[in-house]
């Protein structure tokens, strides 16, 4: 079954996508040997909360 989204829902999805994109871009700058997933989680949380 296909559920149609309202314009507002699409706007929210677009905003969420931008936040995910920004988070992944920031994580890309910090991924290197020796960096733990806990550290990456903290960075991701910081970026997400800043939006």
Swiss-Prot record:
Keywords: Aminopeptidase, Hydrolase, Metal-binding, Protease
InterPro entries on file: Creatinase/aminopeptidase-like (IPR036005), Pept_M24 (IPR000994)
Protein name: Methionine aminopeptidase
Main function: Removes the N-terminal methionine from nascent proteins. The N-terminal methionine is often cleaved when the second residue in the primary sequence is small and uncharged (Met-Ala-, Cys, Gly, Pro, Ser, Thr, or Val). Requires deformylation of the N(alpha)-formylated initiator methionine before it can be hydrolyzed.
Cofactor binding note from Swiss-Prot or TrEMBL: Binds 2 divalent metal cations per subunit. Has a high-affinity and a low affinity metal-binding site. The true nature of the physiological cofactor is under debate. The enzyme is active with cobalt, zinc, manganese or divalent iron ions. Most likely, methionine aminopeptidases function as mononuclear Fe(2+)-metalloproteases under physiological conditions, and the catalytically relevant metal-binding site has been assigned to the histidine-containing high-affinity site.
Lineage, top ranks: Bacteria, Bacillati, Bacillota, Bacilli, Bacillales
EC nos: 3.4.11.18
Quaternary organization: Monomer.
Cofactor(s), by name: Co(2+); Zn(2+); Mn(2+); Fe(2+)
Catalyzed reaction equations: Release of N-terminal amino acids, preferentially methionine, from peptides and arylamides
Family, similarity comment: Belongs to the peptidase M24A family. Methionine aminopeptidase type 1 subfamily.
GO MF annotation: an example: initiator methionyl aminopeptidase activity
GO biological process, one term: proteolysis
